[in-house]
UniProtKB/Swiss-Prot annotation:
This is Protein CT_858. One of its GO terms (biological process) is proteolysis. Coiled coil: none annotated. Belongs to the chlamydial CPn_1016/CT_858/TC_0248 family. Signal peptide: none annotated. It comes from the Bacteria. InterPro entries: ClpP/crotonase-like_dom_sf (IPR029045), CPAF_PDZ (IPR041126), PDZ_sf (IPR036034), Tail-specific_protease (IPR005151). One of its GO terms (molecular function) is serine-type peptidase activity. GO terms for cellular component: outer membrane-bounded periplasmic space. CDD domains: Peptidase_S41_IRBP.
Length: 601
């Protein structure tokens, strides 16, 4: 391994000799400098680095050399080409948190959503145009003469493992490309081969909804760039730096969402593609589970339905959709109205009084705020819930944050003093002395790790010091819970089922989550390659028995994918019938599921 690294370094040096700086275009020079900065970021602050080396066989030096060669061997590269190389460089980490976004507006999409069934077929489940020869329930066979599976293979990132989450990401990209995410954007028409439900096949020509790039390419304007001229009498008008507070880019302040989420949200908004299949959709794509007895109005899709068990007995079951943990991104969120955790609390109080069990739909959830996640979990339990710990990459940035917490809470010794310092709640999680003590403990643990040099991948630390989620003082749902998950649950949406599963609080049903298992930090830096932001993972979450969430995801108790009939007819009847059967078992067997020898129920 050491000889391989030496060889790669020699190769890099040799490449530099044979590619003199003066022979490189301005665009290439800028991209190489930005690549070097990204490499430095990964070396210093990317927590899963060692894990990626073991799990993927990924190597930072080798990946960097490969990207350099791509940039140097392309004659007069365009900015978009360089952006694609940098996106692929970070994409090789196979990390849903890690990625670069760009200042670019070129995009293209086809107004269709496709979903894969349990038998490996691809069906159209949503048509977002008034005029189309394609219908819901049609099967997608080929794209431009190539089988769908082969086309998806070209959309995977390097070092992919072929997981369901990776395939879903490729499937999402199949009909939606954005230069802001480093995609190569198509235009014109493409040919889709489809099969109707009754068996006939046909080819349909469809046109990409294309938006051209409006940001001029640096490669085009480079010849016109002149060195700036300053008059001797010119005075400086640069504003003074405000040092009144510490503006942190540390791992403690960024939402836990995939790197593409902001760009995808913007794409949904600007293209008008409103669909229940969208990530973060308020309603989701599942139909109601039965006759509706009660229904909420507001930010959450929530209702009570009557469900009949195998003995003909009727049960009242609650259904609640949690679309996102980025509460400010909720589709109907009104900043002037009550916060979502207050509405959530009212819904849970109704469920506590009027249901025998609760189904939570958390499919297609992008993640979000960890404190908001804790707030919701605190209302779904009547006992403390143990939390995963985090192995962190620590820098002086995190040390200053730890000192800030300790200074803020230095003389806090009561519930009242805790609320004076922190407010009544932290994104819905009730503040008391225990919260203040957790935060102080967190600060002390960070400082202790720093003083011992335990900074590269620290001893596991509870995030924000929260060893446990404690029940909400007034709202505590204590009846059986069934949580529906899938491969498009990211980050906080990985942690929600982890906490409930590892504490035996809920039955987890569906398919394995995406596996974005750590905290996120974002970096912005001046550049001319059009990089808007770089998002990386700053910690590795560790479950109770030492298992990572990163890349692995959360395995459900009951694996339940969607069948072809579920998807083709858009009723998901087979899926929901099994879910209702499981919930009735939970109700009738005191929260226990009885499986047959073959795993059926």
């Amino acid at each position: 391994m050491k000889m391989n690294r030496i060889w790669l370094l020699l190769l890099t040096f040799s490449s530099a000799i044979h590619s003199p700086v003066q022979g490189e275009s301005l665009v290439c020079k800028n991209a190489l400098q930005d690549l070097s900065f990204l490499e430095h970021l990964l070396q210093v602050k990317y927590a899963p680095k060692t894990w990626k080396e073991q799990y993927l066989g990924w190597d930072l030096v080798q990946s960097s050399v490969s990207a350099q060669q791509k940039l140097r061997t392309q004659e007069n590269p365009s900015t978009s080409f360089c952006q694609q190389v940098l996106a692929d460089f970070i994409g090789g980490l196979n990390d849903f948190h890690a990625g670069v976004t760009f200042f670019a507006i070129e995009s293209a999409y086809l107004p269709y959503t496709v979903q894969k069934s349990s038998d490996g077929r691809f069906y159209f489940v949503d048509i977002m145009t008034f005029s189309s020869e394609i219908r819901v329930g049609d099967e997608l066979l080929e794209v431009d003469g190539a089988p769908v599976q082969d086309v998806l293979a070209t959309l995977y990132g390097s070092n992919h493992k072929g997981t369901a989450a990776e395939e879903s990401a490729a499937l999402r990209t199949l009909f939606s490309r954005m230069a802001s995410l480093g995609h190569k954007v198509p235009s014109g028409r493409t040919t889709l081969k489809i099969r109707r439900p009754f068996g006939t096949t046909r080819e349909v020509r469809v046109k990409w909804r294309y938006v051209p790039e409006g940001v001029g390419d640096l490669a085009t304007i480079a010849p016109s760039i002149r060195a700036p001229q300053l008059q001797k009498s010119m005075r400086s008008f640069f504003p003074k730096k405000d040092d009144a507070f510490h503006r942190s880019s540390s791992l403690f302040y960024s939402p836990m969402v995939p790197h593409f989420w902001a760009e995808l949200r913007n794409h949904y908004a600007t293209s008008g593609l409103k669909s229940g299949y969208n990530i973060g959709s308020t309603d989701g794509f599942l139909p109601v589970i039965g006759p509706v007895i009660w229904e909420s109005e507001g930010l959450f899709r929530a209702y009570i339905s009557s469900v009949t068990d195998g003995d003909g007995k009727s049960h009242k079951v609650g259904f609640l959709r949690i679309p996102t943990y980025s509460w400010q991104d909720m589709e109907d969120f009104d900043p002037s109205g009550p916060p979502p955790w207050e509405e959530f609390a009212k819904i849970i109080q109704v469920f506590s009084s009027n249901t025998e069990a609760l189904i939570i739909d958390q499919t297609n959830n992008p993640g979000g705020s960890v404190l908001y996640l804790y707030a919701l979990l605190s209302m779904l339990t009547d006992r403390p819930l143990e939390l995963p710990k985090h192995r962190m990459i620590l820098t002086q940035d995190e040390v200053v944050d730890a000192l800030d917490w300790l200074t803020l809470l230095e003389n806090v010794d009561t519930n009242v003093e805790s609320r004076l310092a922190l407010g009544d709640n932290m994104e819905g999680y009730t503040v008391d002395l225990q919260v203040a003590e957790y935060l102080k403990s967190f600060g002390r643990q960070v400082l202790n790790c720093w003083s011992k040099g335990d900074i590269e991948l620290s001893t596991p630390i509870p995030l924000f010091g929260f060893e446990k989620i404690h029940p909400h003082p007034r709202v505590q749902y204590s009846k059986p819970i069934c949580v529906l998950i899938n491969e498009q649950d990211f980050s906080c949406a990985d942690f929600f089922p982890v906490v409930l599963k590892d504490n035996d609080r809920a039955l987890i049903v569906g398919t394995r989550t995406a596996g974005a298992g750590g905290f996120v930090f974002n970096v912005q830096f001046p550049n001319r390659t059009g990089i808007k932001t770089c998002s990386l993972t700053g910690s590795l979450a560790v479950r109770e028995h030492g298992a990572f969430i990163e890349n692995i995801g959360v395995e459900p108790h009951i694996d339940l994918p969607f069948t072809a009939n579920d998807i083709r007819y858009k009723g998901y009847s087979e899926y929901l019938d099994k879910v209702k059967k499981l919930v009735c078992q939970l109700i009738n067997n005191d929260g226990t599921i009885i499986l047959a020898e073959d795993g059926s129920f």
